[in-house]
Amino acid sequence: MRILHVLDHSIPLQSGYTFRTLAILEQQRALGWETVHLTSPKHTEPFVPQEQVDGWAFWRTPPATTAFSRLPVLREWALMRQTEQRLLEVIAEEEPDIIHAHSPVLNAIPAIRAGKRAGIPVVYEVRAFWEDAAASHGTGQEFGPRYKATRYLETWALKHADAVTTICEGLRSDIVGRGISPEKVTVIPNAVNADEFTGGGTPDPALLQTLGLTGKSVMDFVGSFYGYEGLHLLCQAMPQILTALPDTKLLLVGGGPEDENLKSLAAKLDLNDHVIFSGRVPHDQVQKYYDLIDLLVYPRVRIRLTDLVTPLKPLEAMAMNKVLIASDVGGHHELIRDGETGTMFKAGDVVDLADTVLRVLKNREDWPRQLAAGREFVANERSWKNSVANYVDVYGRLTTRT
């Protein structure tokens, strides 16, 4: 079986999106399937028609260059037109059995149109809804005209795809609520390869000293600094935490739109000696930073996106044998068993966040139990091998039907 994956972007770019994609491709190859890969014009590397990256071959789509391709709405239409045209070229060359379009809907609509023309079934995989992602990043207004138009396009794609997959139960419920048959929607949950993660590594003394963390209790967040991650709440909780445990440090690894705002907030709260910004770290160096920490914190605020979508980071924390705290948004509830594999606090509540951090830091004798439970959960219930195996039935139904 040959599957043509239609992607927003791919490696060598690094994101949760590309990590999930690569895990899916690796496991599909392990099942004996052939995979072919096309990225949209939004892939930001300089355009080349085809590219090899770490042994993976990618077809690339040229950017739209017409005058109207820089105008709102018309820009998106131009992107979809370019993707559809490139898809038809790749279909003719590769002759896939299935087209598998991954979020956003800008990939799904061209895939559905090209699939209909070529007589090939199309799977649409929803990782998040484009309208919610735009609202959370500040590029769109929730329930505004653009939001409603995008929601209409998403629903159209869900109805016209031959099958729908998604990453979690929250998104599945929303999809079914749009009138899509439950039998049409399959959850392919986010997962990890636990064997690829090491836990309890020895901290690098030189790195500890460089960051000023020697002899300190270290809380950490590793990832992109978006507003919905709630890192401002973590900074606001630090004064209360420091009053009780003055040797606590907060290490923020990464960067993003909120970077400067967070640095300004830390300075305003007189936390420059207690909140450490490492900047972005190469992927192969991230483990060194994880080895420094006692506690991972995921303080996401409650919005539609965080209630519906499950992140990868808490699963990675469990795989690395790290103690974790997370807000009680819906996406976290699907991944974390409160008091068993992690500890949850009331989303948006700075006092409860601080109280929870202090309770966990003062109760280290309970850590081995939680660490073992988390590691067992990801090994038994959230492996990529088990997750990707769910595609067997999805693809099988489509190829039998055709």
Go through each PLM region and give its residues.
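N-terminal subdomain of nucleotide-sugar transferases
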Residues: 1-62, 241, 402
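Short hydrophobic beta-strand element within catalytic cores of glycosyltransferases
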Residues: 298, 316-319, 323-326, 336, ...
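Conserved donor-binding/catalytic core segment of Leloir-type glycosyltransferases
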Residues: 4-6, 213-238
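Conserved acidic donor-binding segment of nucleotide-sugar-dependent glycosyltransferases
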Residues: 338-339, 343-350, 359-365
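Nucleotide-activated donor-binding/catalytic signature segment of Leloir-type glycosyltransferases, i.e.
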Residues: 260-287
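A short, well-ordered alpha-helix in the C-terminal region of glycosyltransferases
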Residues: 352, 359, 366-381, 393
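Acidic donor-binding loop of glycosyltransferase active sites
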Residues: 94-98, 162, 274, 290-307, ...
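Carbohydrate-associated surface elements
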Residues: 170, 191
